[in-house]
Regions:
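Conserved helix-turn-beta segment of the N-terminal RecA-like "Helicase ATP-binding" lobe
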Residues: 131-155, 246-250
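Conserved ATPase-coupling elements of RecA-like P-loop NTPase cores
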Residues: 180-182, 199-213, 236-237
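Conserved Walker A/P-loop ATP-binding site and its immediately adjacent core
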Residues: 104-106, 119-142, 233-238
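Conserved P-loop NTPase motor "coupling/switch" region that bridges the ATPase
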Residues: 120-122, 165, 192, 209-264
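Charged, low-complexity intrinsically disordered regions
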Residues: 1-59, 120, 239
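Walker A/P-loop
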Residues: 90-110
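Conserved helix/coil segment N-terminal to the catalytic DExD/H
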Residues: 156-191
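Conserved pre-motif I regulatory segment
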Residues: 58-96
């Protein structure tokens, strides 16, 4: 196996190329010096399929992504690189890194990489009111000057008007989601949801959880990343609603809260 940084491709020499070409439509057969090779784009989706076929293909993001410097000055920490790469490889994922570990930039680096590789289009960041401007909007402005962001804040009419702007990153507080829920039905271009401080949706009986669940799981196919440094602030049972929000099809999580409660 060879990784071509120039072509951003995985090159395989196979006795039976159809083993790969029949399951990966983007794979192509090439002839190089009399050798039959298969070239596959080195992207997250193709990498996952190749791994399922038994090939030990490395994550593409660390190899091919040109990381913008944080605040225009600092390289990512190793933990941030690992986190960003992990998120890029999972359409539904949790980031449970502690406070001060740079989760915000890690998520934005991962989004930026997926956007550049045309895996996703736009992202909606759902976060506490206190972090909309000074954390998320500032991070986009300072580290990703090539991205546009808008903070959806104010009256319902104002939020809906701001949502119509053609930008890369939309930022809204969790309690403001109700004002744009219906409008998001027709926004298939917003195909990634980042829920910052996911533990705010730890109770499936609240309007917060129900609205988030509608946006994440009932409107269109969307990637969802849940971020929190304290997933179970009150009890282990806090995890159930968060799991059902981000990974509703996870068979390891009981369908009903009572069954989960009895386990933990």
């Amino acid at each position: 196996m060879l990784i071509s940084k120039e072509k951003k491709a995985v090159i395989l020499r196979l006795k039976n190329p159809s083993r790969v070409t029949t399951v990966i439509p983007t794979a192509v057969e090439v002839n190089h010096n009399g050798q039959r090779l298969v070239a596959i784009p080195h992207r997250p989706d193709e990498t996952r399929v190749l791994r399922n076929l038994g090939f030990e293909v490395p994550d593409p993001m660390p190899i091919h992504y040109n990381w913008p410097k944080a605040n225009g000055r600092f390289n990512p920490f190793d933990a941030q690189r690992e986190t960003a790469s992990f998120l890029s490889m999972h359409s539904r994922a949790f980031c449970l890194n502690g406070m001060g570990t740079g989760k915000t930039n890690a998520a934005l680096w991962s989004y930026d990489y997926l956007r550049r590789t045309k895996v996703v289009n736009k992202v909606l960041v759902v976060c506490p009111l206190s972090t909309m401007e000074r954390t998320w909007a500032d991070s986009v402005f300072n580290t990703f000057p090539h991205l546009d962001a808008v903070v959806l804040h104010g009256t319902k009419d104002k939020r809906l008007k701001l949502l119509k702007q053609d930008v890369h990153v939309y930022i809204i507080n969790i309690d403001g989601l109700a004002t744009i829920r219906d409008a998001l039905k027709d926004r298939d271009d917003i195909d990634l949801i980042v829920v910052d401080e996911l533990a705010l949706a730890r109770n499936s009986g609240t309007d917060r959880w129900k609205i988030l669940n509608t946006i994440c799981n009932k409107q269109s196919v969307r990637r969802v990343w849940g971020m929190t440094g304290s997933p179970t602030p009150n009890a282990p049972t806090d995890a159930w609603a968060q799991c059902k929000l981000v990974t509703p099809d996870n068979s390891a999580v009981p369908k009903y809260f009572s069954a989960f409660r009895d386990r933990v």
